[in-house]
């Protein structure tokens, strides 16, 4: 049977690159909304968890396109800020760029000592096939610290201030191939890939 298209429900180019690299085996099947010429705004993330927000996006795109969908939601949780930024990471600080968001985080933490700067990236990935009534959710988490200043221009989002002790670098300083061995998104989508492998062998997609 012909392989079915799987839609990637994100407009974040950084996330698109990472997900396609992690799921490279399915690169011919996974299509972005732009590639499929669906000019749509994704729905407002009104959920109270990463899982809920990811599924809100997946369900919305599935209903419009009719295709199986992959979506995700992720965030940065900082202990010293009582778990912020969490599900509001992308909206933190309002409609400003990530340089400004990073500056706001560092300002909030200017008096926080190193031992209290623990943080983690969380990712929840969703595969949703509306026609087959299949919904799979996987997750990934990576622990680190909030650096005192941004370092590196690789990656995207909050990567330049997320210090990863194992490599003694921020995520903004490491190559994408290296990041894709350890990141929260890699962990979540590696688990999702195991499901896709079995699902495809079953002839579903």
From Swiss-Prot:
Protein name: dITP/XTP pyrophosphatase
Cystine bridges: none
GO CC list: cytosol
Organism, scientific name: Dictyoglomus thermophilum (strain ATCC 35947 / DSM 3960 / H-6-12)
EC numbers on record: 3.6.1.66
Cofactor note: Binds 1 Mg(2+) ion per subunit.
Superkingdom of origin organism: Bacteria
GO terms under biological process: nucleotide metabolic process; purine nucleoside triphosphate catabolic process
Protein residues bound to Mg(2+): 44, 73
């Amino acid at each position: 049977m012909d392989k079915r298209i799987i839609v990637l429900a994100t407009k974040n180019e950084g996330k698109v690159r990472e997900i396609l690299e992690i799921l490279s085996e399915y690169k011919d099947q996974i299509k972005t909304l732009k590639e499929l010429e669906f000019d749509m705004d994704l729905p407002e993330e009104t959920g109270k968890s990463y899982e809920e927000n990811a599924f809100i996006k997946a369900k919305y795109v599935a209903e419009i396109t009719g295709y199986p969908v992959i979506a995700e939601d992720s965030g940065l949780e900082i202990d010293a800020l009582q778990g912020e930024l969490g599900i509001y990471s992308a909206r933190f600080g309002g409609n400003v760029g990530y340089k400004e968001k990073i500056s706001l985080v560092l300002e909030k933490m200017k008096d926080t000592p190193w031992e209290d700067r623990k943080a983690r990236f969380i990712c929840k990935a969703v595969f949703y096939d509306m026609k087959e009534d299949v919904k799979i959710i996987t997750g990934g988490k990576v622990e680190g610290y909030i650096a005192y200043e941004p370092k590196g221009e690789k990656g995207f989002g909050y990567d330049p201030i997320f210090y990863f002790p194992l490599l003694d670098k921020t995520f903004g300083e490491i190559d994408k191939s290296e990041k894709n061995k350890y990141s929260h998104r890699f962990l979540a989508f590696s688990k999702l890939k195991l499901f896709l492998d079995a699902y495809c062998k079953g002839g579903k997609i």
